[in-house]
């Protein structure tokens, strides 16, 4: 079980379509479940246009993606995770339908995924991917969600 830590969380819904489904209390519980250290995190739900702009400007990829994580470290000795995590509502809803999951279930996975990225986890190599996916599966199970990698 991961250690629960102090959290300062800001949630922004410029794309308001999911704010009644993916509520602030749910988001707080999902973020806290994935935290290994104290954190200051902003979650922002955007439409496809903003998601595409951010992905193009920061990753050089000209399409909207499901989640983008921007991790910030003010100093290397800081124990506080600081990040902006951007979730694209359009992509989230499309992927949930394609994967036959509820929007809530898929959003929980993407939030956990983004929080792990903010803490330095990645999936560039097979070993990194295995470690990150194992953590995601454990965290989501603790939250009452099924393994997100089954039937993909």
From Swiss-Prot:
One GO BP annotation of this record: rRNA processing
A molecular function GO annotation: metalloendopeptidase activity
Short name of any one Pfam family annotated for the protein: YbeY
Record EC number: 3.1.-.-
A Gene Ontology term for the protein's cellular component: cytoplasm
Top EC group: hydrolase
Named cofactor requirement(s): Zn(2+)
Disulfide bond entries: none
UniProt keyword list: Cytoplasm, Endonuclease, Hydrolase, Metal-binding, Nuclease, Ribosome biogenesis, rRNA processing, Zinc
Cofactor note: Binds 1 zinc ion.
Compartments it resides in: Cytoplasm
This protein's record includes keyword Secreted: no
Binding residue positions for Zn(2+): 113, 117, 123
NCBIfam families according to UniProt: rRNA maturation RNase YbeY (TIGR00043)
Role description: Single strand-specific metallo-endoribonuclease involved in late-stage 70S ribosome quality control and in maturation of the 3' terminus of the 16S rRNA.
Family: Belongs to the endoribonuclease YbeY family.
Protein's name in the database: Endoribonuclease YbeY
